[in-house]
Amino acid sequence: MFDVTVSEGVKLNKSTFRNALAREGSFVTNWREQPWTGVFGATLCPFQADESLDVPGLRQYITELTHADGMQGLVCNGHTGEIMSLSPAERQQVTRIVAETVADCRRPIKVISGVSAEGSLEAINHARSARDAGADAILLMPPHHWLRFGRLSSTAVGFVKDVADAADIDVIVHQYPAWTKAGYTLDEMKEMVRHERVVMIKMGTRDMARWLYDYERLKAVAPDVSIVTCHDEFLLPTLLEGADGALIGFAGFAPTLLVRMVHAALDGDLAAARQCQKTVAPLARLIYNFGEPGCGAHQRMKVARWLLGRFPSPHFRRPVRPLTQDAINQIRGALAELAITL
């Protein structure tokens, strides 16, 4: 049960929380007391040389991430975790391993599992599998055939509602970039956040001109639903414009640094956040090459952590090919120049 204490010691469950906040005309200001705010690190997925899952390596990596004080949640089976190369059974296996490892750390860290499916029934089944494996929520991606063909507004809203109605697990809506045919409109998201099981929007719109406008209007409709940035390349600007946290692959790469930076921004400590940004910026250029997360980012993350002795292997699953030796040498040189300690 979702419970929160607000002014005058009144305790509300989630079913009445939105109405109470609307009557007060304000939001709960202490973000640290909220269940879906802060830093949610998207995790990498290690493979053996034969392309099988590296289970011991995954446990070791997740254990390290749990040691980042202040990490609010871990997100497996995202794009950073190469969900598209994992079978449904492997996605559930990865979720179970992450949930078991988090449970062993004896600190409350939420487990979120990505769901990518082409239809409502398949997505519901995958969401239930994640729930059964120990996930606290799912990250619901839009069906990828929308990227090519688009969709009707009723289809977009209906897809989220179908899964939220039937899966019996909290839902994080993954907003894709505005330039794709799979991104949601503001009106569509306003419908989605009204659903009881929708707890967060991972706001990947990448339209900075609309960021604050959309944030304020979504919070007006559903103040208890977190709006978090996934803009690794615009992390500090989006946090300062208006965000309740960050759900990013970069936090699965440099967890302690990213927790420190996001927390400073959420606390309003601009000087500390900008100091962190001085270290984050060159790392982001190394991983993202001045752009948004793309097809090669998780490769560079894996190789960089492996070169630093912080990841079990640099292996990928086909059709992804290994980085060239020149690319590996470039990463090695950049890491040496930056003298980074993750």
PLM region descriptions:
Residues 177-284:
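Catalytic alpha/beta core domains of metabolic enzymes, predominantly
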Residues 3-10, 20-22:
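Acidic, Ala/Val/Gly-enriched low-complexity intrinsically disordered segments
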Residues 21, 27-29, 38-44, 64, ...:
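C-terminal alpha-helical cap/extension of soluble enzyme domains
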Residues 58, 95, 123, 160, ...:
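A general structural signal for well-ordered alpha-helical segments in protein cores
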Residues 24-183, 321:
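Active-site beta->alpha loop and helix N-cap motifs at the rims of alpha/beta catalytic domains
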Residues 101-109, 134, 167-169, 194-197, ...:
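Short helix-capping segments at alpha-helix termini
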Residues 43, 78, 142-143, 205, ...:
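Short secondary-structure boundary segments
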